[in-house]
Amino acid sequence: MSITENAIASAEAHSAHNYHPLPVVIATAEGAWMTDVEGRRYLDMLAGYSALNFGHGNRRLLDAARAQLDRVTLTSRAFHHDRFADFCTRLAELCGMESVLPMNTGAEAVETAVKTARKWGYRVKGVPDGMAKIIVAANNFHGRTTTIVSFSTDPEAREDFGPYTPGFEIVPYGDLTALREAMTENTVAVLMEPIQGEAGVLVPPPGYLPGVRELTRERDVLFIADEIQSGLGRTGKTFACEHEGVVPDMYLLGKALGGGVVPVSAVVSSREVLGVFRPGEHGSTFGGNPLACAVALEVVAMLRTGEFQQRAAELGEHLHQELGLLVGGGAVEEVRGRGLWAGVDIAPALGTGREISKKLMERGVLVKDTHGSTIRIAPPLVISKEDLDWGLEQLRGVLRH
Ligand SMILES: *Cc1c(COP(=O)(O)O)cnc(C)c1O
């Protein structure tokens, strides 16, 4: 057995099989490149589902982490620490909002948003106790907790995990009429991804997000934008909502917020909305810890200049131009996305998304398939144009054979 085969067999023997990774075992990484245990190099075109927007081993982020490691890493929220105020202030500023509630994982940010919206509904909007409803979109991905899978439409994510949490209404994504009809006086929030990532990088029809904004404002309903994957530079703007000129009531952030170093997530909203919480009503031992705040503070500082957003916009235009040329030739059926983020539907005759991903791996490019024959391309925003072009050449190579 090779070193790789050995490592995989031993991982499979001693871990739950809740993932089906490509047969590659990474040992080190830098920038947009990863190296496996046998010294082979791969271009990372997944970037940890956008957690690695700033690349592997980013100097600024590692320096910020190292400096904080030597000071203090954890206090719990039982005490104040000297990174917390800066982190909350700067992140709120970046979002154009007032208040931040830090958590760790994306799923926790979503859970926090659900609790916030319900409490806001009862205390501010005046919804009768226990009646609050949250509207979500079909084919959503918001995480893996029991409540979140309760409003998933993906059988794989849901099956055998019931009983399910009530209080959610599912409408087709992109359909304003359906959303309007689903709203009642007990609707407290609409929770949506401005671009559906796991569904295959689905961009809603133009006018949809502004329509959601208008409807939610009219009906006194919170518009919660899950920007955990789409936010923080990926689409060529700080937030995907900006492409449609939309400002939601609440941003959910995660993934890139931790710079690929530590898990950091946050709910960002107004003082009124997040003001529903009183001490003891919600929290997390690790949420807003000093190490997380130090790294995320650096992430926010990097985003403040706009350089990463601009890079994603420019390279993204190039990416979509090149991918667009592949459509119609028989191999690629459709390409969607914004900025450095693309969902590519490969003709099923050429193989499943998994088979295509494996062939790309053999050529030194790592991507992840999603439903059926779709692969998603989302390299770190620090990728060079030359490397991006090389990666695209490998994709063309796979599609030719
Ligand atoms: C990844 C993701 C989540 C969940 O984040 P975790 O950190 O994996 O819990 C939620 N929403 C969206 C849109 C995501 O892409």
What is the meaning of each model-derived region?
Residues M1-H401:
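Conserved N-terminal phosphate-binding loop of PLP-dependent enzymes in the Aspartate aminotransferase
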